[in-house]
Amino acid sequence: MSATAEQNARNPKGKGGFARTVSQRKRKRLFLIGGALAVLAVAVGLMLTAFNQDIRFFRTPADLTEQDMTSGARFRLGGLVEEGSVSRTGSELRFTVTDTIKTVKVVFEGIPPDLFREGQGVVAEGRFGSDGLFRADNVLAKHDENYVPKDLANSLKKKGVWEGK
């Protein structure tokens, strides 16, 4: 007896074999789609976690909150290097960033950019230390006399403390 004849003998209506096969295909397809969606969800979750850890929010001294100063979160601090505030001790550079409303003391360990100087725009990347000082691990200075980072320029213009381009 052939396989089809055996199926028909067990299932006189002849539907069982075909119906089971279609049902199994649908179930298999649903599992594949569900698995692909689960993998996609995990990938998106990992990407968002990585982006969240790498995002560095921009703040001026007047924008800072108590949470910014105590959370240990990394962000970018922007403003102008206050006149008379720069001091060097070995490889440590200390200076004050201001937006003319508030000031923040910054400590940077390393060599500052060539164009770093008092009265110029600066963006420092880092976090606040337990001592209340902003610990920068990267300092960016303007690269010509007309350049101020766009975020910094917009923020300073909103506060009415800068009138540049």
From Swiss-Prot:
The keyword Transmembrane applies. The keyword Transmembrane helix applies. InterPro entries: CcmE, CcmE-like_sf, NA-bd_OB-fold. The chain crosses the membrane at residues 30-50. SUPFAM superfamilies: Heme chaperone CcmE. Residues 51-165 are periplasmic. It holds the Pfam family CcmE. GO terms for cellular component: plasma membrane. Keywords: Cell inner membrane, Cell membrane, Cytochrome c-type biogenesis, Heme, Iron, Membrane, Metal-binding, Signal-anchor, Transmembrane, Transmembrane helix. It is a single-pass type II membrane protein. GO terms for biological process: cytochrome complex assembly. Heme binds at H143, Y147. One of its GO terms (molecular function) is metal ion binding. It comes from the Bacteria. Residues 1-29 are cytoplasmic. Coiled coil: none annotated. It is found in: Cell inner membrane. Heme chaperone required for the biogenesis of c-type cytochromes. Transiently binds heme delivered by CcmC and transfers the heme to apo-cytochromes in a process facilitated by CcmF and CcmH. Belongs to the CcmE/CycJ family. This is Cytochrome c-type biogenesis protein CcmE. It comes from Brucella canis (strain ATCC 23365 / NCTC 10854 / RM-666). The lineage of its organism: Bacteria, Pseudomonadati, Pseudomonadota, Alphaproteobacteria, Hyphomicrobiales.
